Regions:
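N-terminal Rossmann-like NAD(P)+-binding subdomain of aldehyde/semialdehyde dehydrogenases
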Residues: 1-79
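Rossmann-like NAD(P) dinucleotide-binding subdomain of oxidoreductase/dehydrogenase enzymes
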Residues: 33, 64, 70-141
């Protein structure tokens, strides 16, 4: 996968924040809530929306810039495997956010109880630029 510049990642993440803010009660989010609940009966629309709203402070450009300024930049893209739990809607999203901001190519193993929300969010961010995120059934490496 291509190495993305940090600014591109920040743009995509802040776009997602705006998208959530503007569309949380509209399509295609409404369809995603239905699919997620079909997969996990505990993932009610209200619970998913609550989780999404908790991400909003992380998805502000200023917050993202402040966050990355605290760390030395990885010049060379590294591979990172993330195994997501499934007890809270999109619980692995913060790990993905940190991996992207750290210039990592991600292998993400989703929980069997949450295979809808995170791919949906990555898809929303990837509309203009492909992100270095690959969903896998088994972590290799």
């Amino acid at each position: 996968m291509n190495t993305m510049k940090k600014e591109e990642i920040i743009e995509r993440l802040s776009f997602l924040g705006e998208d959530i803010r503007e569309n949380i009660d509209k399509e295609p989010y409404l369809s995603m809530y239905i699919k997620a609940q079909q997969e996990n009966a505990w993932f009610l629309k209200e619970n998913i929306q609550y989780s999404l709203k908790q991400f909003l402070p992380w998805l502000e450009k200023k917050e993202l810039h402040d966050f990355v300024a605290k760390y030395e930049e990885n010049k060379k893209q590294k591979n990172l495997a993330i195994v997501c739990a499934g007890n809270i809607p999109a619980v692995g999203f913060h790990d993905i956010l940190c991996g992207l901001l750290s210039n990592c190519s991600l292998q993400v193993k989703l929980s069997s109880n949450d295979k809808v929300i995170i791919p949906f969010l990555i898809n929303r961010m990837s509309e203009k630029t492909e992100l270095p995120v690959r969903f896998v059934d088994k972590i290799n490496g």
